Amino acid sequence: MTKIEKIVLSYSGGLDTSIILKWLQETYGCEVVTFTADLGQGEELEPARAKAEMSGVKDIRIVDLREEFVSDFVFPMLRANALYEGQYLLGSSIARPLIAKHLVGIAREVGADAVAHGATGKGNDQIRFELAVNALDPSIKVIAPWRQWNIRSRLQLSEYAEKHRIPVPSDKRGEAPFSIDANLLHTSTEGKSLENPAEVAPDHVYQRTVDPVDAPDTPEIITVGFERGDPVSVNGKAMTPAALLTELNGLGGRHGVGRLDLVENRFIGMKSRGIYETPGGTILLAAHRGIESITLDRAAAHLKDEIMPRYAELIYNGFWFAPEREMLQALIDHSQAFVSGEVTLRLYKGSASVISRASPCSLYSADLVTFEESTIAFDHHDAEGFIRLNGLRLRSWAARNGR
């Protein structure tokens, strides 16, 4: 077997990847480069640098990917109104292909033989990372420590950390923390008491949103502007993609928008329960649907609705770089040519409700739909022929069945 000389590790600075860093150094006896993607998770970045330095890492990469994350991954997904199993806004799923892209890029830059990740053998992320690497550079070896070492539990992980003097994190109450994944689109919380779906999630698991019960008693009215399917402004102020999502996270979070307690079906075959907070994404989904409602043709809108579950499943399962996802993306992007305008929403105690929408490209005609006298010629008698033709097969079916 060819000896591995250099590894690039996707590194968060959390317990798992801190232990993996040490394990890689001991097991392979080679240089390990750490790569930390700044996706808007916040506090983790500088501590990650310090921990990597303490472990003897010479090449530490912390890359600001916030704008690329939102513009090239979140917004294309938003154009599809993507929801996995009708609920999940794919906050973790959509981040993995971007991380993998830069993991591969750094590996090529530094001449690494392999990349490594901290995903467990039970989760979806191992699949997402490795399918992405397969699509981007099959020559790069992927090391998945959770599938190779003898550590089989969180207790054993803590024992390894203690043996090697790796700090074991705790939450504000001094307890072992939940498993948390955060980026500009969402925060997910899993593990511990949440593994029992019959147990109500404790209040302290929520980090980005207030309890809707405690949200302001006065609604807040906001406006989101769109150009060709992508959000470009909030309350009339143009913003970069990352700044826009950050702004909506703040607005939605204080009104308790975007909470989801979900049991989902993992690609690998088991069910899992997670708490998701996606305030900005929830607002954008409602707003995007609102602007599409007046700018998309009926058949085009219905076709988008039909392909959306397949598109969302491809992202969830790790096929972002697969040809079928790119084919669907081309169709979705083509549909957005006239999806421009403004949507006004009311944020109130956990809800983000569309209350008005306007577009220079609108297909909505008040003159055509009005109950009053119209200037547009529409003969009500034409509906009789329309109904008769559409009822033809039903009359034949009824006659056959003796109705």
Swiss-Prot record:
Q: Which UniProt keywords apply?
A: Amino-acid biosynthesis, Arginine biosynthesis, ATP-binding, Cytoplasm, Ligase, Nucleotide-binding
Which reaction equation describes what this protein catalyses? L-citrulline + L-aspartate + ATP = 2-(N(omega)-L-arginino)succinate + AMP + diphosphate + H(+)
GO MF terms, alphabetically ordered: argininosuccinate synthase activity; ATP binding
Q: Where in the cell is it found?
A: Cytoplasm
Keyword Ribonucleoprotein assigned to the entry: answer is: no
- Family from the record: Belongs to the argininosuccinate synthase family. Type 1 subfamily.
Protein name per UniProt: Argininosuccinate synthase 1
Q: Which organism is it from?
A: Rhizobium johnstonii (strain DSM 114642 / LMG 32736 / 3841) (Rhizobium leguminosarum bv. viciae)
Taxonomy of the source species: Bacteria, Pseudomonadati, Pseudomonadota, Alphaproteobacteria, Hyphomicrobiales
